[in-house]
Design a protein with these regions (language model features):
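Sequence-level motif detector for i,i+2 pairs with an aromatic at +2
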Residues: 1, 48-50, 79
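Membrane-targeting and insertion segments and their boundary/processing signals
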Residues: 2-6, 24-27, 36, 70-74
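Enriched for short, Lys/Arg-rich terminal
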Residues: 4, 58-59, 64-113
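Arg/Lys-rich, positively charged N-terminal/basic patches that mediate binding to nucleic acids
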Residues: 1-25, 104-105, 109-113
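A short, surface-exposed loop/turn module that caps and links secondary-structure elements
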Residues: 29-54
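General secondary-structure edge motif
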Residues: 5, 9-12, 33, 42, ...
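Short charge-dense sequence patches
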Residues: 9-16, 47-57
C-alpha cells in the first residue's frame, strides 16, 4: 500500500469548504492507498510527478516520485508516498497547476507542509 500525506492547510481547506461531504472526499483520496496509479498526470518538475484526482467539480493535486509510479507495479509501490498539496475548482485549475509547478521549480517539495 502507498502512503498518503495531506498537508495541514489542504486538510483544513477541505473540512471548511465541504463540511460533511469532506468524509467522502478523504475516502476518495485514501483509496489511492490501494491503487496509487489512479489520477490524471498533469506534469513533471525535477522528477516529481504532479497528478490530479477529481471529485465532482473540484480537483485535488498530489505529488509523487515520477520514476516509481511509472516503472513499478501496484504491489511494488508499498513505500511510495503520495503528498496531496492543493485543491481547485474548474475555474482556477490552471492557475493552481502553475503555482504548484512554480513552487517546485523554485523551492522544492519541502515548501508543501
Amino acid at each position: 500500500m502507498a502512503i498518503i500525506l495531506i498537508t495541514k492547510n489542504l486538510e483544513e481547506e477541505i473540512n471548511k469548504k465541504f463540511k460533511k461531504e469532506s468524509i467522502k472526499i478523504f475516502e476518495h483520496i485514501y483509496s489511492l492507498k490501494e491503487n496509487p496509479k489512479k489520477g490524471k498526470e498533469i506534469g513533471v518538475v525535477g522528477g516529481i510527478l504532479i497528478k490530479e484526482l477529481k471529485h465532482k467539480n473540484h480537483r485535488f493535486y498530489f505529488l509523487v516520485d515520477g520514476y516509481k509510479i511509472k516503472i513499478l507495479s501496484i504491489k511494488e509501490l508499498s513505500n511510495c508516498v503520495l503528498k496531496f498539496v492543493r485543491m481547485s475548482d474548474k475555474n482556477t485549475q490552471q492557475k493552481v497547476i502553475n503555482e504548484i509547478k512554480d513552487i517546485l521549480r523554485k523551492i522544492g517539495e519541502e515548501h508543501f507542509t
